[in-house]
UniProtKB/Swiss-Prot annotation:
This is Ribosome-binding factor A. One of its GO terms (molecular function) is ribosomal small subunit binding. GO terms for biological process: maturation of SSU-rRNA. Gene3D superfamilies: 3.30.300.20. Monomer. Binds 30S ribosomal subunits, but not 50S ribosomal subunits or 70S ribosomes. It comes from Salinibacter ruber (strain DSM 13855 / M31).
């Protein structure tokens, strides 16, 4: 990716995040966070990775369907904000970024391992005390 393409990706990420926060926060429930963006070399498509803080998979899927249906509207708002900074306004494609959920899953796994280790140490001490 060229430096220009990277800059456009950063600009698109920042501006789409602002648009979602300011213009769509009331319509997009649960909260949506744009975690990263990637733009094709010809600037025709921006791949936006989003994390959705929903309680259920159904909520998250519904939010992504809503994002997809709003993509053209969001692109028009993006165009009005960045038209003077870029040659072409990319088409927006939203994808689910599972990295935050994966990090949370790993953290929970480490917590369970730590708890199991502590329990085994306590059980080991208890059985050592019983032998004395």
């Amino acid at each position: 990716m060229s430096v220009y393409t990277e800059r456009v990706a950063e600009l698109v990420q920042r501006e789409v995040a602002r648009i979602l926060q300011r213009e769509y926060a009331d319509r997009l429930q649960p909260m949506v966070t744009i975690t990263r963006a990637r733009v094709t070399g010809d600037l025709s498509i921006a791949y936006l990775y989003a994390s959705v803080m929903g309680d259920t998979a159904e909520e998250r899927e519904a939010t992504f369907r809503q994002l997809e249906s709003l993509a053209d509207e969001i692109r028009n708002q993006l165009a009005s904000r960045i038209r003077h900074k870029v040659r072409e306004i990319p088409e927006l494609k939203f994808f689910h970024d599972e990295s935050l959920e994966e990090a949370k899953r790993m953290e929970n796994l480490f917590d369970r391992i730590r708890e199991e280790r502590e329990r085994r140490l306590e059980d080991g001490e208890d059985s050592a005390d019983a032998r004395e």
